[in-house]
């Protein structure tokens, strides 16, 4: 449906919301860049956790929209429910367990549907409110 890099660029804002409580310093850094160039207007120092993640994610999607880049998986021609199912199945593959464990918010395979499922649904629709934080 799309290249790995393109998929990562679409997914980054959604994972920023999920990981936000664990990566606040990084979000403030990158958020400052988005703010400097007008993609974020909020005072990042007044925000924390999920709220900070949502504001930075909105800055990311504002930039993407400005350059005509997709911000939702549903904007990719040919994207279907099967792609979500395959992604969730791949994330639960025991051979990839170390990838789950090395994320800013470590997961185990039994948590994939509970946490990654809503991230993918949010990325399909563009609705950050669907993301469930740990």
Each PLM stretch: what is its role?
Residues 1-59:
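Active-site segments that bind and position negatively charged phosphate/pyrophosphate groups
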């Amino acid at each position: 449906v799309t290249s790995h890099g393109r998929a990562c660029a679409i997914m980054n804002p959604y994972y920023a919301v999920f990981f936000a409580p664990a990566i606040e310093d990084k979000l403030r850094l990158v958020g400052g860049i988005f703010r400097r160039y007008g993609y974020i207007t909020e005072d990042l120092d007044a925000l924390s956790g999920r709220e900070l993640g949502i504001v930075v994610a909105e800055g990311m999607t504002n930039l993407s929209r400005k350059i005509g880049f997709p911000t939702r998986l549903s904007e990719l021609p040919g994207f279907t429910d099967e792609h979500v199912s395959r992604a969730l199945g791949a994330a639960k593959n025991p051979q990839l367990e170390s990838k789950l464990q090395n994320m800013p918010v470590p997961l185990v395979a039994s948590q994939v549907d509970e946490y990654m499922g809503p991230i993918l649904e949010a990325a399909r629709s563009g609705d950050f409110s669907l993301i469930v934080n740990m």
